[in-house]
Amino acid sequence: MEKRNIRDHKRRLLATKYELRRKLYKAFCNDPALPSDMRDKHRYKLSKLPRNSSFARVRNRCISTGRPRSVYEFFRISRIVFRGLASRGPLMGIKKSSW
């Protein structure tokens, strides 16, 4: 596994760990019914959470090459690896189309 994939995996774990807390703080920050000092307190708590605990920093990567672009989510591999595996035949149910 590449270093980038390991880093992305750690980000995914952190994001799931802090997901509920982050959503709660965001809801309190955006609630206009609360007093401004209470919203500021929750905004401060939100800023103190780890950066990598945000789902915006998670990126889908190919599990074999670590490529971040053009990754098929169902297979978790890039289009280049997918084409090679599909032509060789180890992907079940995938075959080259012809008409």
Swiss-Prot record:
The keyword Oxidoreductase does not apply. Belongs to the universal ribosomal protein uS14 family. It comes from the Eukaryota. This is Small ribosomal subunit protein uS14m. One of its GO terms (biological process) is translation. PANTHER family: 30S RIBOSOMAL PROTEIN S14 (PTHR19836), RIBOSOMAL PROTEIN S14 (PTHR19836:SF30). It is found in: Mitochondrion. GO terms for cellular component: mitochondrion; small ribosomal subunit. Its main location: mitochondrion. Keywords: Mitochondrion, Ribonucleoprotein, Ribosomal protein. InterPro entries: Ribosomal_uS14 (IPR001209), Ribosomal_uS14_CS (IPR018271). The lineage of its organism: Eukaryota, Viridiplantae, Streptophyta, Embryophyta, Tracheophyta. It comes from Oenothera berteroana (Bertero's evening primrose). GO terms for molecular function: structural constituent of ribosome. The keyword Ribosomal protein applies.
